[in-house]
Amino acid sequence: MEGGSSSSNGTSYLLAFGENNSGGLCPMTMMPLVTSHHAGHHPINPSNNNNVNTNCLFIPNCSNSTGTPSIMLHNNHNNNKTDDDDNNNNTGLGYYFMESDHHHHHHGNNNNNGSSSSSSSSAVKAKIMAHPHYHRLLAAYVNCQKVGAPPEVVARLEEACASAATMAGGDAAAGSSCIGEDPALDQFMEAYCEMLTKYEQELSKPLKEAMLFLQRIECQFKNLTISSSDFASNEGGDRNGSSEEDVDLHNMIDPQAEDRDLKGQLLRKYSGYLGSLKQEFMKKRKKGKLPKEARQQLLEWWNRHYKWPYPSESQKLALAESTGLDQKQINNWFINQRKRHWKPSEDMQFVVMDPSHPHYYMDNVLGNPFPMDLSHPML
């Protein structure tokens, strides 16, 4: 892979991880340099019409034979410039790193370009590796490469970064610098560290959003797989709710557990609450939406006592116990049923008004002296 600026007055840097023939990782990141007016008074020899790659920076430069991954900072600068172009355009920040070469371009010839470029690259490489922000720059670049990478690739990146930092620290220990000695180099390191940090943030943002979206979808699919049988198997014997004191260590939620185990732990811990909520929900059902079994029992009683469908209080208690309903629901059901489906006959209307039949009075609590399963001969 290669990169660089195709214009005559542009300077760009190419960051690469690993050597192509060393088995390392080789993603490339192309970034423009921040412009600076430093060293703008050094023109390049107009007689040199060849494009010369004046600066190759390796951070650090590991030999290919070792197979150790390395990080390379490559500056491809086009030197095909005239005196007018050099006077009319600002010089890029990377131009500072060729300052030691410019005198060779003024007074040398093409045979000296290779050696001067090599010496300049070594000098700039040493300056960058000795700068206090070098480890920050190295870590920022590796963090960009780690975004979205699988775990094994992340491990290799961290290993290579640590190896490169250790090697660079050993090579630059003798010539370490401090902030303020070289303002242009300080600006270069600060600008690229900030640029790489922002680049990592921009890369991470869509990845995090995608991961959150997938987690929500996965959670929704898991909720759909919970069947009613799972709740029924965990409701028995614990309908009155569970307290935190009743939960032992075995029922504590383990965040590292598998999805299936986590589902079982949640059901065991909160089955009592779920049972209570289900009972409360059943009580708050809409009127007329009684359970099918309860309505069937009420209809059977209605058919047996159709001539006088007014259950006594004891019969209402018996119906409430057998159907699981409360007396208010039973009263409402009988009231609605009589309004819609029952009209007393003329004989029954006369009997209601006859004092000789007190057990048919609607307001008489003890009106029906017979058990629930027996009927009066007149009924």
Curated annotation (Swiss-Prot):
Statement: the UniProt record of this protein carries the keyword Mitochondrion: no
GO cellular component, one term: nucleus
Keywords attached to this entry: Activator, DNA-binding, Homeobox, Nucleus, Transcription, Transcription regulation
Pfam families (UniProt xref): ELK, Homeobox_KN, KNOX1, KNOX2
Subcellular location: Nucleus
DNA-binding region per Swiss-Prot/TrEMBL record: 282-345
Domain ELK: 261-281
Region (Disordered): 75-125
Any one GO molecular function term: DNA binding
Superkingdom of origin organism: Eukaryota
Job description of the protein: Possible transcription activator involved in early embryonic development. Probably binds to the DNA sequence 5'-TGAC-3'.
PANTHER family: HOMEOBOX PROTEIN TRANSCRIPTION FACTORS (PTHR11850)
Protein name: Homeobox protein SBH1
Species of origin: Glycine max (Soybean)
